[in-house]
Amino acid sequence: MWHYRRMAKTPARPTPWARWMFRTTVTAEALLAFAQPVLIGGFLQGHYASLQLHKENATFTGVTAMVMLLAAVLQWRPGRGPAWPVFASLTVVAAIVAQIITGYARTLAVHVPLGVLIITGDVLLLVQVWKPARAVTEDAGAPAETVTAGSGHAS
């Protein structure tokens, strides 16, 4: 006789479209954030048009972060995904709003370190969303049943 273990419940996974949309917006957000220090570096090297590009890219980065937040909400509620991306995206949006405000105010003592934190957060988020999904059951604490083949009874 052989035995097999029956899991307590089927795992709930985010729907593929919601996961794809969130991954795409996180990737775009990270790429736009990576461009910011490159653009301001160009300005510091004497390419004065780079400052305008830095400002415009900040706007695109902020809009992308808001779309990322929307994608996180769609992955969470109708998409049956986890809630943590909503909170992570909300944090990124708040940080970018503060970044834009400090940039226009030319408060560089806050603007530069905040930019480093935003890029670090975007990298961590990017790594997290591109990790392969783990098989997790809804009720991970419930013991699995052992079923004996042919008996139809769980033990």
What are the residue ranges of the model-derived segments?
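Polytopic transmembrane helical bundles with strong interfacial aromatic enrichment
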Residues: 2-155
